[in-house]
């Protein structure tokens, strides 16, 4: 067996996270569950998935598997030349106990203990203004819920699961294997109860013995003012159903703020770019500035330069931590005209002369130049 076969069984890459492995296991386990999939070979595939997950879900077993393959994960290393001689493997009192301790016995976990359900993620888009002022959104999604027919037991109403006759409720079987190092002991998932410790003689017809069913779910999310892209809101108990009576997992709402056509934002500060003419910059003016709180008047002092930034106090977004309101920064951009009529050109030339600017005056426009300008203006 190569060192990627277990990953292939679950359909994940070798660098998959534990969360990815867990999700893939649940998907494949449900796909090949003998109570659901009656196709030939489905039961064997189900066992293969269980075997792969048993190793990859344990960080120490996974590390051994990545380095040595299945033999490493199961404790079956072969002895090298002049290797671990002197171990006769008598009984089970020595070497195999070291490996059992190193790899962590799977039987120590109680398969019947309540376990919390999986967490879910949901992405919500917000307009620029919704992120600034806050909003309440209703989100709809599908989740694994406790089966309404069997109430999560997996058994047909009127019946109940019984203790597994093979593993006696432990969910695992102990297998002893003779190796060059001596007798090695390993634990595998029980092939009768598939690790649950229980047998369901008469499965529920709604959930086919899983105890869960897919359900459309809605929940209202209160999004506070001042949030930003990437922030999360945790809704406790709105994830997927638990196991053996365990609680539901949580829902994490991930926020994405859509861009504004006129504003930019960083934290509680909002940024706005203002175009003004060079006469407004030179002589000064009072202009109306849009903000998320409404238009306000702002004075442009005479002699304002391109790149000058003005601050409108309290016109930004709320501060999530510490309270208070941010500011809006207005950056000025002086627009140079690209076309001048004769009167404008002469006025500017007179201004240049009065300022003492030394310029090479452009030649006076002739008849054809004026015709060309007139055509461009049509």
Swiss-Prot record:
SUPFAM superfamilies for the chain: Chaperone J-domain, DnaJ/Hsp40 cysteine-rich domain, HSP40/DnaJ peptide-binding domain
Residues that hold Zn(2+) 1 according to the record: 147, 150, 204, 207
Any Pfam family: DnaJ_C
Start-end of CR-type zinc fingers: 134-216
Positions of transmembrane segments: none
GO molecular function, one term: ATP binding
UniProt xrefs under CDD domains: DnaJ, DnaJ_C, DnaJ_zf
InterPro entries, per database record: DnaJ, DnaJ_C, DnaJ_domain, DnaJ_domain_CS, HSP40/DnaJ_pept-bd, HSP_DnaJ_Cys-rich_dom, HSP_DnaJ_Cys-rich_dom_sf, J_dom_sf
Cofactor binding, per record: Binds 2 Zn(2+) ions per monomer.
Keyword terms: Chaperone, Cytoplasm, DNA replication, Metal-binding, Repeat, Stress response, Zinc, Zinc-finger
Any one of the GO CC terms: cytoplasm
Record note on quaternary structure: Homodimer.
PANTHER family on file: CHAPERONE PROTEIN DNAJ, DNAJ HOMOLOG 1, MITOCHONDRIAL-RELATED
Protein name: Chaperone protein DnaJ
């Amino acid at each position: 067996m190569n060192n990627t076969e277990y990953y292939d069984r679950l359909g994940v890459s070798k660098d998959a996270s534990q969360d990815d492995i867990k999700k893939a296991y649940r998907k494949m386990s449900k796909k090949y569950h003998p109570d659901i999939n009656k196709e030939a070979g489905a039961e064997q595939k189900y066992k293969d998935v269980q075997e792969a997950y048993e190793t990859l879900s344990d960080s120490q077993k996974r590390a051994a598997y990545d380095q040595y393959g299945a033999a490493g994960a199961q404790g079956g290393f072969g002895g090298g030349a002049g290797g671990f001689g002197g171990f006769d493997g008598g009984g089970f009192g020595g070497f195999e106990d070291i490996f059992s301790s190193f790899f962590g016995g799977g039987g120590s976990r109680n398969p019947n203990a309540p376990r919390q359900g999986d967490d879910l993620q949901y992405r919500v888009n917000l307009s620029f203004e919704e992120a600034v002022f806050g909003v309440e959104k209703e989100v709809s999604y599908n989740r694994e819920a406790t089966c309404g027919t069997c109430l999560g037991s997996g058994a047909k109403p009127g019946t109940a699961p019984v203790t597994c006759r093979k593993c006696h409720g432990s969910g695992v079987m102990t297998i002893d294997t003779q190796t060059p190092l001596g007798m090695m002991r390993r634990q595998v998932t029980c092939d009768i109860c598939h690790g649950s410790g229980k047998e369901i003689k008469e499965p529920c017809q709604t959930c086919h013995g899983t105890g869960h069913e897919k359900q459309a779910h809605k929940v209202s999310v209160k999004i506070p003012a001042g949030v930003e892209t990437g922030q999360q809101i945790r809704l406790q108990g709105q994830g997927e159903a638990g196991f053996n009576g365990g609680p539901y997992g949580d829902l994490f709402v991930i926020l994405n703020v859509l861009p504004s056509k006129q504003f930019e934002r960083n934290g509680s500060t909002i940024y706005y770019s203002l175009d003004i003419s060079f006469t407004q910059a030179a002589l000064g003016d009072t202009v109306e500035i849009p903000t998320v709180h409404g238009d306000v008047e702002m004075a442009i002092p005479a002699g304002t330069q391109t790149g000058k930034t003005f601050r409108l106090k309290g016109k930004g977004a709320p501060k999530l931590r510490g309270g208070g309101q941010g500011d809006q920064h207005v950056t000025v951009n002086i627009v140079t005209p690209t076309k001048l009529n004769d009167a404008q050109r002469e006025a500017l030339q007179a201004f240049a002369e009065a300022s003492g600017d030394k310029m090479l005056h452009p030649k006076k426009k002739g008849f054809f130049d004026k015709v060309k300008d007139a055509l461009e203006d049509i």
